[in-house]
A protein has these predicted regions:
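Short amphipathic alpha-helical interaction segments
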Residues: 41-57
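Flexible, gly/ser-rich surface segments that form the specificity/activation loops bordering the active-site cleft
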Residues: 188-250, 256-260, 276-292
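Catalytic-histidine neighborhood of serine endopeptidases
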Residues: 78-93, 102, 124-126, 132-174, ...
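C-terminal subregion of chymotrypsin/trypsin-like serine protease catalytic domains
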Residues: 63-64, 267-332
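N-terminal activation segment of mature serine protease catalytic domains
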Residues: 84-128, 138, 315-316, 324-328
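Short amphipathic alpha-helical interface segments
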Residues: 1-42
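A short, conserved structural fragment
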Residues: 56-68
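Terminal peptide-recognition signature
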Residues: 115, 129, 135-136, 140, ...
Length: 332
C-alpha cells in the first residue's frame, strides 16, 4: 500500500546535486499534488495537512512561496523537499517521523526477539535480541547468553533459528554479543539500521522483561537520553577491581528490568542508537541506579565496532555453536 508521507516527499523532491538542474526544475504546489487523479475526491485533507506540517517542522519539507491562485485555501503554496532520499524513504524514516513510535513498534515487532536461556544451574531466564544490518545478525547483551547451556531464539512465527557462531569482545567488560544466524527464519523481517545517539532525544525501547504468570511478550517504553557518562581510565567500579578503559555509556530515564537486557534503544527515525546493558559494579551501586529508575545503554558505535571484528583481530573471539532440539549452545 502506498505511503502518503513518502509520496508527498517524492512528489515535491528536487535534485540539488547540480545547480543548473535546480534552475530547470519547475516547482510544484499543493494544488498540483491534490489534483492528481488518484487523489481527486479521495484524499484525507486533515491527514495530508498534518503530514505537511510535521515535515515542515522537521525541516524535511520547505515552503517555496505562494502562487497567486489555487483551488483550495492552502493549495497555492509551493513546497520543496530538497533532501529527499529514496533509501531513507524505503527504510521508513519519513513515515516514522509523521506517524510516531507506534508505527516504529509495528514495523520492527518481528526484529526484536526474546532470547530464552537455561543456565548451567538449570534455571530459566530471558533477555532480548534484535536484528541489525541484515537478516542474519542478532545483537544482544553478553550476560544474556554467556555461560548458558541452552539458548532458544525464534522468529515471530515460532520457527527456530539455527546459529553458526557467537562473537564476544575479548574485554569481558563489554556487554555485547553478536549471534550469527545460519538459516533464513528472518528472511521477511525488517532489520534495524544504526546511528549515533543524541542527548535529550526521545527514544523507544522494546524488550521482554519477565512477568510472573505470563509468556514472553513485548513491552514498550518511551523515554529520553538524559546524559552520557564516560568511565575514565583505571577507575575502580566494583569490589572485584574491574577497570573500564574509556568506555562510553548513556543514561536512559526509563526503568529497565531483567529481560530488557539486550533491548534496542530506538530514536524517532526508527534507527537503533544503542542497547540496554549491564555494567560491572558492586551490588550497592547497582541498587542505587535501580532505585533511581535509570537504564544504561551502550551506544551503537560500540556495537558496530565489533560487528567488523574490532579494530584488531585480537579484539574478539568467535565461538562455534551446536544446534540441538530446542535451540543452540555455545561451544567453548
Amino acid at each position: 500500500m502506498p505511503d502518503l508521507t513518502n509520496e508527498i516527499l517524492e512528489f515535491f523532491s528536487i535534485d540539488t546535486s547540480d545547480q543548473s538542474l535546480v534552475e530547470k526544475q519547475i516547482p510544484k504546489s499543493i494544488d498540483d499534488f491534490v489534483s492528481q487523479p488518484q487523489y481527486l475526491n479521495t484524499l484525507d485533507l486533515h491527514k495530508f495537512t498534518k503530514i505537511i506540517n510535521i515535515l515542515k517542522n522537521e525541516g524535511i519539507l520547505m515552503s517555496g512561496g505562494i502562487l497567486p491562485n489555487g483551488n483550495l485555501p492552502i493549495s497555492n503554496e509551493v513546497l520543496i523537499a530538497p533532501s529527499y532520499d529514496a533509501a531513507v524513504a524505503q527504510y521508513g524514516t519519513y513515515s516514522f517521523l509523521t506517524n510516531g513510535f507506534v508505527s516504529i513498534a509495528e514495523s520492527f515487532a518481528g526484529a526484536v526477539r526474546p532470547i530464552v536461556i537455561v543456565s548451567n544451574d538449570d534455571e530459566p531466564d530471558i533477555g532480548t535480541g534484535f536484528l541489525l544490518g541484515n537478516k542474519h545478525t542478532v545483537i544482544t547483551a553478553r550476560h544474556v547468553v554467556d555461560n548458558a547451556k541452552l539458548i532458544t531464539l525464534t522468529n515471530s512465527k515460532g520457527e527456530l533459528a539455527t546459529v553458526r557462531e557467537v562473537i564476544f569482545p575479548n574485554d569481558k567488560n563489554i556487554d555485547i554479543a553478536i549471534i550469527l544466524v545460519d538459516n533464513f527464519v528472518f528472511y521477511d523481517t525488517k532489520h534495524f539500521n544504526a546511528v549515533a545517539p543524541e542527548i535529550l532525544e526521545q527514544v523507544l525501547t522494546i524488550g521482554y522483561p519477565p512477568i510472573p504468570g505470563f509468556d514472553a511478550f513485548q513491552l514498550y517504553e518511551i523515554s529520553s537520553i538524559n546524559n552520557s557518562y564516560k568511565f575514565s581510565n583505571g577507575q575502580i567500579i566494583g569490589k572485584e577491581i574491574s577497570y573500564l578503559d574509556g568506555i562510553e555509556y548513556f543514561i536512559l530515564n526509563a526503568k529497565v528490568k531483567g529481560g530488557n537486557s539486550g533491548s534496542p534503544v530506538i530514536n524517532r527515525s526508527g534507527n537503533m542508537i544503542g542497547m540496554i546493558i549491564q555494567i560491572p559494579m558492586d551490588s550497592e551501586d547497582f541498587d542505587k541506579i535501580d532505585k533511581l529508575g535509570y537504564g544504561i545503554l551502550t551506544p551503537s558505535s560500540e556495537i558496530v565496532k565489533y560487528l567488523g571484528g574490532g579494530e584488531k583481530k585480537e579484539d574478539v573471539t568467535i565461538f562455534r555453536c551446536e544446534n540441538i532440539d530446542k535451540g543452540f549452545r555455545i561451544l567453548t
